[in-house]
Amino acid sequence: MKKIVQNKFIAACLFIAVFAACNKDVEYVAEPLNVSEEMSYVKVIHVAPNFTTLTTLADKVNMLYTTSNGMYEKINGTTLAYDNMFPTATNTYVAINSGLIPVRFSIGGVVLADSINFYKTSLTLRPGKKYSYFLTDNVTSSAMFFEDDVPVLGNDQISFRFVHAILNDTAGKNVDLYSVKNAANIYENISPTIATGFEKKPFYNNDTLIVRRSGTGFELARINGLTTVGGRSYSVVYRGNGKVTTSTAK
């Protein structure tokens, strides 16, 4: 039986969203976000494939924050399951108050809107800044909360970061991100829970990007036909189940 590790790529741009699982094409395009210096902006991404196994809870997650009047308000719309994010690509961030903001995660209920709270924390949000919160298999960790500090770009530039969001891969956790077109690694030896900073990069025109075991040619996941647009900032997210093997690729 051919052994294929079931990992996936998301190429999720801040301004253009591109979702890919192996060889899927571009699906969504989003407009640039208008930013107010009085608010902060948050996106939540569910990349925990083993959420139900680890928590024994239904995989229908809500993220809520405390408003200025002390009430909790949902960040997301419909509940999130694995491989979902909110806002979707056509609406890139949720605007909420700045400061030290208590947040909680709950399970969307049938009778009650939020029947079970399973995690509480506080986030420090700076005015006018954008953030991404990745819900991983370490569901009670705030380690994957990042400021999306993108550089100022000209129309002939892009910025790019790589996010390693697979926490349940026991063998060879660190990975490289390889560009077929350039025949070279873009990033090397990236550990789980790490997001590189946004870096200015040349355009990618119909390139294939491959996640490989660090220091080897062993392929774990790929995205085919990646073409970028000048003036945009891209997040490429490596997520999925690092322990699952199967005879066919998904």
Please describe what each predicted stretch is.
Residues 1-23:
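Sec-dependent bacterial lipoprotein signal peptides
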Residues 22-250:
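Intrinsically disordered, low-complexity polar regions and short flexible loop motifs
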